[in-house]
Amino acid sequence: MSLIPSSGKARWAIKVCVITGCLMVSGALFASRFVIGVNPQSGLGCIDANLLLIDKADTTPKKGQIFAYRAMQAEPIYSNGTLMAKYLAAVPGDTVEVTRDYRILVNGQEFTRGLPLLIDVPVDELDRFIGRRTLQADEYWMLGDKPRSFDSRYWGPIHASQIVGRGYVIF
């Protein structure tokens, strides 16, 4: 009895098994490095993206790039641990300032402006959102490029341990 299949059906079945196995291994390798992220803030217009490919292997912060992170200060708007993606606007050593006229400056350069999500905050509480700070080691300032973005201008910097990976816009 030969172990080599002689019929066309048997050869076809072997090919299907090999292709299926290759697809499963490829899928597992892809999933171990990448995750698909859906922008939960699409209605707020935070960044021009609804779907992102997140590279979990690329966690080295680079200013100006989109990074996904686990939000830990976004309650009650979003649960702690919610995956978010924003532009990395400032890195350790950078100075971030939110001015009285609601301009957001990074090292003196305007990144964006506005704090529209504070419309219902009493005037006497607005001062806690205004100020200047120099980011410490492992602190990163995440900003959307739209005024209505819910980002670091409202809850401060994130820690390096919150970064999941670099985001690439799919659409």
What residue spans do the PLM features occupy?
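Mid-length scaffold segments of soluble, non-membrane domains
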Residues: S79, L83-F111
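Protein maturation boundaries and topogenic segments
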Residues: M1-L83, T99, R153-F171
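Generic structural detector for well-ordered beta-strands
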Residues: L53-D55, A89, T134
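Generic structural signal for buried aliphatic residues
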Residues: L52, F67, V96, Y140-W141, ...
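PP2C/PPM family metal-dependent serine/threonine protein phosphatase catalytic domain
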Residues: N107-R128
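Residue-level recognition of short, solvent-exposed, well-ordered loop/turn junctions
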Residues: I47, K62, V91, T99, ...
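Short, exposed beta-strand/loop patches in secreted or surface proteins that constitute
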Residues: S42-G45, L88, V96-E97, R132-R133
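Beta-strand-rich cores of mature extracytoplasmic or soluble domains
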Residues: V121-F171
